[in-house]
Amino acid sequence: VLAASPGSLLTSRPVKRTFPTAQDAEAAFYEALEKADLEAMMEVWAEDEEVVCIHPGGPRLAGYEPVRESWAQIFKSGQRLKVHLTNQVVLSGMMLAVHSLHENITVGGEAKPRPPVVTTNVYSRTATGWRMLVHHASPAPQAPVRAAGDGPKVLH
């Protein structure tokens, strides 16, 4: 689908899908991830230089083009992922939604999922629906093996 602008024929800028809720945007994000569909993935993201993406064990990527390139590289690997979401906590307001969750990812034909990935997704309500601003995914810490009599350790 192409966008028409006043006084011209058609422009080459494709019209992005509209996501009426942050949950709709999130569902589209994970569907695109499982299908390794770059165009569908980037429909979810805000076209903004302030977007941020951190893949597990990876650097902080800021800006639409670096984020797009990172997904292109991931999808080019040919590995197909199946993602099961758990431990979801959703904080939402009129203009911003924050989703904290665990991604339980199974790669290719593996029988068991990999260790969970702790993820935070941030969405903003725009004139064209909800769009992703931040995707931060980090490996979940492994539960430490405690010696008998060891109490819990509090970081802060």
Each model region followed by its residue ranges:
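A beta-strand edge to alpha-helix "cap/lid" segment located at domain peripheries
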Residues: 4-43, 50-156
